[in-house]
């Protein structure tokens, strides 16, 4: 009997230990527990358990914390956060920051995220920090952003006739999804909202922001042991009651008004992480106090977006004051597509309050007045065409997503450029004439930049063909010949596609050089000329690349491409040329004088070298050439060129 009792006691001990281990592995629910769909407030936070069917348990703990379990569900959401009245934008609420920590154990499809809704427009949004077996949302990303030290991919999806806070509806979903999972940290929610709006993903009036665990046809449990939501840091400032004097000829941000009669007007996000005003209706007025017009202004420009044709009256001192002029605004295509429109106004001098009177819906980013003499005379206000002009130092631009950003090594550049965008640089002084332009650019795809005088539809001076540099962070100089102009002009760069631009500079016309009179800056024909040191080139895909053993070469060449090398000094004469090349296919290189269609001096016949990494020297006879000449290499097919050199007559 004693042995049997001992065995039974041992078995009981083992069972108890097993039960303790099992209990230790399952979250202990000790707070207020709910099992089915319910909303309310708890610990100063709004909570909700929502499911379509299945087994769910949610424990409401102190503050924003909670734990949850789910199994055999279709879709279930557990969340604690803050709800609003759908009467304020995120800018008006101020910065929204979530600090969180979660023991997250999904089995199948699930998300750990910040979740919420906006109204007008109706948007369901997710900032996904971690996930289960499937990374949402299974769509093509619109781009990437970096927030809180992490990289997120951005998505936009459409839900048609699906459940929403307003019943069954069709609405947009916005997603930020981390490229690597995490289950604790800080989420700067407002920064995500700003980046979404930069991409044209318009936010409405805030309904909710909550830390959320969502499950979909899965099971699992989670313990949110930290969830602190801070709202209200750095809100949009209220209109100033004691305005200082403002310069009419500097940009005035539309949201920096002093008073309005509107009950619907709101401060909204604009591209480039800016702000503006929107939700404007017929009869709304906005007043800006103490605008200093100095000796006079006769023009007005505003950056606006609208889907309907409308107009804005510009009045002095009151909504019924002197009508200075009317700005007629045509549809820009969408509420997120901003364009600058201008109008003449009656001359106004001194200091006045300015009132904008609206006839219908429009979003306004900013506005500015122009002086009575809108085109300054050449002089101290001009820019030297032959000194580097930073791309970000434009006087005006077109393109809602265009941005100025910092470069890793210092300085700034412009990017987020799309087809049809443009930047204008006023009062560029070309003095006695120019010959070419060089721009420092980076792009992952081939594109082009038109150089125009007098506006985006002005005289076309030339086109810069930009090959892929392989990365948005890999910058190269590209050059193009331009039609000659003299004096002072406004220059506009018109873009045909995505490209980052650091700076550009023009090259003056060399009025002193002649074909037989070498001048400073000439290059000896009898020393190696590096192929990448061309003065201009033709061919959208041509690239400069690094060689394994050091140095550079040109490649990605196609039939009809060419490179030009200026001021090559042949002295008393040269009769042959040698080039160091690599190619997988036989091809030819014509050596021409002056231009791609100039006098043919000779042709280099290039046999296959076995690969594009195997370089050999090939030679050809050319017509005797003396003096200083511009030399053009014209290619008939793919080849990489390291350098070339000419040989003197008789050698």
UniProtKB/Swiss-Prot annotation:
GO terms, biological process: cellulose catabolic process; xylan catabolic process
Main location as per UniProt: secreted
Molecular-function annotations in GO: carbohydrate binding; endo-1,4-beta-xylanase activity; metal ion binding
Comment on pH dependence: Optimum pH is 6.5-7.0.
InterPro entries linked: CBM6 (IPR005084), Cellulose-bd_IV (IPR006584), ConA-like_dom_sf (IPR013320), Galactose-bd-like_sf (IPR008979), GH11/12 (IPR013319), GH11_AS_1 (IPR018208), GH11_AS_2 (IPR033119), GH11_dom (IPR033123)
Induction behaviour: Up-regulated by growth on xylan.
Sequence repeat ranges, renumbered to this chain: 278-339, 415-476, 555-616
Enzyme Commission identifier(s): 3.2.1.8
UniProt-annotated binding residues for Ca(2+) 2: 530, 532, 552, 642
Reactions catalysed, as given in the entry: Endohydrolysis of (1->4)-beta-D-xylosidic linkages in xylans
Positions of region (3 X 61 AA approximate repeats): 278-616
GO cellular component entries: extracellular region
Sequence positions that bind D-xylotriose 2: 556, 613, 640
Keyword vocabulary terms for this entry: Calcium, Carbohydrate metabolism, Cellulose degradation, Glycosidase, Hydrolase, Metal-binding, Polysaccharide degradation, Repeat, Secreted, Signal, Xylan degradation
Active site: 124, 214
Cellular compartment(s): Secreted
N-terminal signal peptide: 1-30
Pfam families listed in its UniProt record: CBM_6 (PF03422), Glyco_hydro_11 (PF00457)
Protein task: Endoxylanase that degrades arabinoxylan and glucuronoxylan to xylobiose and xylotriose (in vitro).
PANTHER family: ENDO-1,4-BETA-XYLANASE A-RELATED
Domain remark from Swiss-Prot or TrEMBL: XynA is a modular enzyme. The number of CBM6 (carbohydrate binding type-6) domains varies between strains. The polymeric substrate can interact with several of these CBM6 domains.
Family to which the UniProt record says this protein belongs: Belongs to the glycosyl hydrolase 11 (cellulase G) family.
Protein name: Endo-1,4-beta-xylanase A
Organism: Thermoclostridium stercorarium (Clostridium stercorarium)
């Amino acid at each position: 009997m004693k042995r049997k009792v001992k065995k039974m006691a041992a078995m009981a001990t083992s069972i108890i230990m097993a039960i303790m281990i099992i209990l230790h592995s399952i979250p202990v629910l000790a707070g207020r527990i709910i099992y089915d769909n319910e909303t309310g407030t708890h610990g100063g936070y709004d909570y909700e358990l929502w499911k379509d069917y299945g087994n769910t348990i949610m424990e409401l703990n102190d503050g924003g914390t909670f734990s949850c379990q789910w199994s055999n569900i279709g879709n279930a959401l557990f969340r604690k956060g803050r709800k609003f009245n759908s009467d304020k934008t995120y800018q008006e609420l101020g910065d929204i920051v979530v600090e969180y920590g979660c023991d997250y154990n999904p089995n199948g499809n699930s998300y750990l995220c910040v979740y919420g809704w906006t109204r007008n427009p109706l948007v369901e949004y997710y900032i996904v920090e971690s996930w289960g077996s499937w990374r949402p949302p299974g769509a093509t990303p619109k781009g990437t952003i970096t927030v809180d030290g992490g990289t997120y991919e951005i998505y936009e999806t459409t839900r048609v006739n699906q459940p929403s806070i307003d019943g069954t509806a069709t609405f947009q979903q916005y997603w930020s999804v981390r490229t690597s999972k995490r289950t604790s940290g800080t989420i700067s929610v407002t920064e995500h909202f700003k980046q979404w709006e930069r991409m044209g993903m318009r936010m409405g009036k805030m309904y909710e922001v909550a830390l959320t665990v969502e499950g979909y046809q899965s099971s699992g449990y989670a313990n949110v042991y930290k969830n602190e939501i801070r709202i209200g840091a750095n809100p949009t400032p209220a209109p100033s009651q004691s305005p200082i004097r403002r310069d009419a000829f500097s940009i005035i941000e539309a949201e920096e008004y002093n008073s309005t009669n509107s009950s619907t007007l709101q401060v909204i996000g604009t591209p480039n992480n800016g702000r503006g005003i929107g939700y404007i209706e017929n009869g709304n007025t906005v007043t800006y106090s103490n605008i200093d017009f100095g000796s006079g202004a006769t023009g007005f420009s505003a950056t606006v977006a609208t889907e309907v044709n409308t107009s804005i009256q510009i009045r002095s001192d009151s909504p019924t004051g002197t009508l200075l002029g009317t700005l007629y605004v045509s549809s820009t295509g969408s509420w997120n597509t901003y364009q600058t429109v201008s109008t003449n106004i009656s001359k106004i001098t001194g200091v006045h309050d300015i009132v904008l009177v609206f006839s219908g819906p429009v979003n306004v980013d900013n506005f500015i007045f122009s002086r009575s003499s809108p085109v300054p005379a050449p002089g101290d206000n001009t820019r030297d065409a032959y000194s580097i002009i930073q791309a970000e130092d434009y006087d005006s631009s077109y393109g809602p997503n265009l941005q100025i950003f910092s470069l890793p090594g210092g300085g700034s550049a412009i990017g987020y450029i799309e087809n049809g965008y443009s930047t204008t640089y006023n009062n560029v002084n070309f003095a006695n004439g120019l010959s070419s332009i060089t721009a420092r650019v980076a792009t992952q795809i081939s594109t082009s930049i038109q150089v125009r005088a007098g506006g985006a539809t002005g005289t076309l001076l030339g086109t810069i063909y930009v090959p892929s540099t392989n990365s948005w962070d890999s910058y190269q100089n590209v050059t193009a010949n331009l039609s000659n102009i003299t004096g002072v002009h406004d220059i506009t760069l018109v873009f045909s596609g995505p490209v980052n631009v650091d700076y550009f500079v023009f090259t003056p016309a060399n009025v002193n050089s002649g074909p037989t009179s070498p001048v400073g800056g000439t290059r000896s024909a009898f020393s190696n000329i590096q192929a990448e040191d061309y003065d201009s080139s033709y061919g959208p895909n041509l690239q400069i690349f690094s060689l394994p053993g050091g140095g550079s070469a040109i490649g990605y060449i196609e039939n009809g491409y060419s490179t030009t090398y200026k001021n090559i000094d042949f002295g008393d004469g040269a009769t042959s040329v040698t080039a160091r090349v690599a190619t997988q296919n036989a091809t030819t290189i014509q050596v021409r004088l002056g231009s791609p269609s100039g006098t043919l001096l000779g042709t280099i016949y290039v046999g296959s070298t076995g690969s594009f990494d195997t370089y050999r020297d090939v030679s050809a006879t050319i017509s005797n050439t003396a003096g200083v000449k511009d030399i053009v290499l014209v290619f008939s097919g793919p080849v990489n060129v390291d350098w070339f050199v000419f040989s003197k007559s008789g050698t």
